[in-house]
Amino acid sequence: MENEPDTICILVDADACPVKAEIYRVAERHNLPVVIVANSFIAIPREAQRVERVVVSGNLDAADDWIAEHSRPGAVVVTADIPLASHALEKGASVIAPNGRIHTQSTIGNTLATRNLMDSLRSAGEVTGGPAPFAPKDRSAFLSALDLAIVRLKRAGFHAS
């Protein structure tokens, strides 16, 4: 992964990410490096350019820990994991969920509190189920959010390497 402080890169929490193909296409269009981080081997299409695979081992949060450690201004982190999103924002990264939700410093506190509350309710048997199934509108929202994040970073002085 290119680690120049003024370059844009995309870090992907890849184990359950439903938008990897979209990330590859957008990254190729903008000539950006992508780092796919997972707890197990993830296939990368042969035609995907500038994609690095990082397979971490160890605990369940090893991929999240790796991404948090490598988050920085100029990085776009793609994750559905709210605690990871919070850590990445603390490091100055831009954060997008696979459904297109853009996390910011001003929204992550409420999002984290809601996640923790729902976790507690599920543990107590009060709430069952999880998030809604991934839908085509989520894919579209994600593509828009990723393009917006890249444009904002370029306007802020970051560039493709």
UniProtKB/Swiss-Prot annotation:
* Protein's recorded name: UPF0178 protein BAB1_1980
PANTHER family linked to this entry? UPF0178 PROTEIN YAII
Q: Which family does it belong to?
A: Belongs to the UPF0178 family.
Give the species: Brucella abortus (strain 2308)
Q: Which domain of life is it from?
A: Bacteria
